[in-house]
């Protein structure tokens, strides 16, 4: 699942294989929901199948609030500071939540994580005192969330979400009032 942006416009996290994180939004607006997994783990004829998890909550704040992280194949996305419920804050910007972890497989000959969730975008501004980082991508190729434009860790276009890692199937990171990253390409495994 992809991370969500920190923003002033109400929105929701979208459903997917794993759900997207909820956006951060100002107090006085309805608390936005995170996305749900459309293929959660469930029993089947030969064991369980499906590995989706929901996204995390964004921050409900009087200033710019960070978005929640997207769900990964292994764990749900996180809200701010790892909380799984809406947080309120009066701080001058809040970081994004981390993406959920993916699942580990040894199909390549070594243990590798796949399908991590994207990190949520940080909620900040151009004010240098509001230097806010995006959430970390989940283990398994999730993209990092975008930081505020003047974060001390910022590079050009740092407020954009980062793409998921190629061939890992991770979600893209959310932006800081900007574009989110693209999900990383997956892999095809042929057993013979």
Q: Where in this protein do the model-derived segments appear?
A:
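Low-complexity, glycine/proline-biased repetitive segments and flexible coils/loops
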Residues: 1-192
């Amino acid at each position: 699942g992809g991370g969500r942006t920190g923003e002033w416009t109400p929105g929701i996290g979208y459903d997917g294989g794993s759900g997207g994180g909820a956006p951060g939004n100002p107090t006085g607006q309805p608390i936005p929901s995170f996305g749900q997994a459309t293929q959660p783990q469930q029993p089947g004829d030969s064991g369980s199948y499906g590995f989706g998890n929901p996204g995390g909550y964004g921050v409900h704040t009087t200033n710019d609030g960070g978005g929640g992280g997207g769900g990964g194949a292994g764990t749900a996305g996180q809200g701010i500071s790892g909380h799984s419920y809406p947080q309120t804050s009066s701080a001058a910007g809040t970081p994004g939540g981390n993406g959920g972890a993916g699942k580990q497989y040894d199909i390549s000959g070594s243990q590798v994580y796949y399908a991590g969730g994207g990190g949520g975008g940080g909620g900040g501004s151009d004010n240098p005192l509001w230097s806010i980082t995006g959430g970390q991508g989940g283990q398994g190729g999730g993209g990092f969330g975008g930081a505020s434009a003047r974060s001390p860790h910022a590079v050009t276009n740092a407020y954009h979400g980062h793409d998921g890692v190629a061939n890992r199937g991770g979600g893209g990171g959310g932006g800081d009032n900007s574009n989110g990253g693209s999900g990383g390409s997956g892999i095809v495994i042929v057993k013979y």
